[in-house]
Design a protein with these regions (language model features):
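Short, solvent-exposed loop/turn elements at beta->coil junctions and helix N-caps
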Residues: 7-9, 102-107
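Acidic, metal-coordinating catalytic segment for phosphate/diphosphate chemistry
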Residues: 7-42, 47-48
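A short coil-to-beta-strand element that immediately follows conserved catalytic motifs
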Residues: 2, 94-101
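Nudix hydrolase/Nudix homology domain
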Residues: 64, 75, 108, 133-170
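Beta-rich strand-turn-strand
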Residues: 77-81, 90-96
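Conserved Nudix-box catalytic region and its N-terminal flanking loop in Nudix hydrolases
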Residues: 30-33, 42, 47-85, 131-135
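Short loop segments at secondary-structure junctions
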Residues: 24-25, 45-48, 57, 120-125, ...
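Active-site-adjacent beta-strand/loop module that shapes the phosphate/pyrophosphate-binding cleft
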Residues: 15-26, 107-127
Length: 170
């Protein structure tokens, strides 16, 4: 299969491309959700010995869900820089230690989005968190012990992956 044409068909808060894919003698028309690159982090507060997640309303499930801190990479920003910014915006912490868990396509059948997932250790809260007012973010912070986090019925894929990584570490 080979992409022979690409055209932006929607350019709003998110972007959608229309691709023409050559498959032998057949040309297929496919839509591609193109939100950009994102970062996420499982955050551990070493001073309080608690994992800190977020809860906010999400359009996909049309509900509030618990998930790890996450956000979009701005322009040519490095993933490490973006995740530090997002942790401060959403949770109010400065990052002490950062470890990459995985770079992944969360939904490669329909989306070009790539998410880099990190583990972050924090100990200094220098902001309020809760998200940015200008982005209309209303983010609640949730604290978990390791045991309660491992038992939490999570539904967000990047969060499930980060918590499974934690479980495998022992």
């Amino acid at each position: 299969m080979q992409i022979i044409d690409r055209r932006r068909v929607f350019d709003g808060h998110y972007k959608v491309n229309q691709l023409i894919v050559q498959d032998g003698d057949v040309q297929l028309k496919r839509e591609q959700f193109a939100p950009g690159k994102a970062v996420a982090a499982l955050v551990y507060d070493t001073a309080r010995q608690l994992y800190v997640l977020t809860r906010q309303f999400r359009i996909g499930p049309e509900a509030e869900i618990a998930e790890i801190a996450a956000g979009m990479i701005d322009g040519d920003e490095a993933p490490e820089t973006a995740v530090r910014r997002e942790i401060h915006e959403e949770l109010g912490y400065e990052v002490d230690k950062l470890e990459k868990i995985v770079e992944m396509w969360p939904s490669p059948g329909t989306s070009s989005e790539i998410i880099t997932v990190f583990y972050a250790e924090v100990s200094r809260k220098t902001g309020d968190g809760g998200g940015l007012a200008e982005e209309n973010e209303k983010i609640e912070m949730l604290d978990f012990t390791k045991e309660t986090l491992l038992a939490e019925p999570l539904q967000d894929a990047k969060t499930v992956i980060a918590v499974q990584w934690l479980r495998l570490r022992g």
